[in-house]
């Protein structure tokens, strides 16, 4: 039994993004897009303090007021859920992830989820859009699997965001 219930209407919530180096360093997507250069400059400054011998260049990912990511990951017990992957497929429907500049990896949260996504055609839609479907396993959230390239900007729908969580070589530009 519970003492009380807190009900939140998620349709009134804005999607958010957490920047390095802590989950609390979060902004609404709208806020991030509007102020990307300034926010990424702040990440670069903090990176210089944490890793003084390294040179990070995230601001180059902002061109003409738009943010260009090198990699996308949908994974883990939060991101790899059926609804998240189904929604990603709906967003990408009849579109492409591009010609090789951007890579998108999708890790369903479990084999039953993966099977259902395949049965209803979601996996096919994602593959046609250019995504790579990976095996279900607990790992992408802590850096096992797709590690970002040096000075690459990786957008991840996962549960973790700590220093060196996704990139293990800060000396080579991985955060």
Feature map (PLM): residue ranges:
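Fe-S-dependent hydro-lyases/dehydratases of central metabolism
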Residues: 1-175
């Amino acid at each position: 039994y519970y003492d009380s219930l807190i009900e939140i209407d998620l349709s009134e919530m804005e999607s958010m993004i957490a920047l390095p180096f802590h989950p609390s360093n979060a902004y609404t997507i709208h806020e991030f897009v509007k102020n990307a250069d300034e926010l990424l400059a702040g990440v670069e400054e903090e990176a210089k303090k944490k890793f003084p011998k390294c040179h990070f260049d995230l601001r180059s990912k902002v061109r003409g007021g738009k943010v260009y990511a090198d990699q996308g990951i949908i994974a883990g017990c939060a991101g790899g859920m059926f609804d998240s992957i189904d929604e990603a497929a709906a967003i990408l429907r009849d579109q492409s992830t591009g010609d090789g500049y951007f890579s998108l990896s999708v890790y369903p949260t479990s084999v039953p989820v993966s099977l259902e996504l395949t049965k209803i055609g979601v996996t096919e839609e994602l593959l046609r859009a250019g995504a790579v479907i990976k095996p279900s396993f607990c790992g992408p959230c802590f850096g096992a699997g797709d590690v970002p390239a040096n000075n690459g900007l990786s957008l991840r729908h996962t549960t973790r965001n700590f220093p060196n969580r996704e990139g293990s070589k800060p000396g080579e530009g991985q955060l």
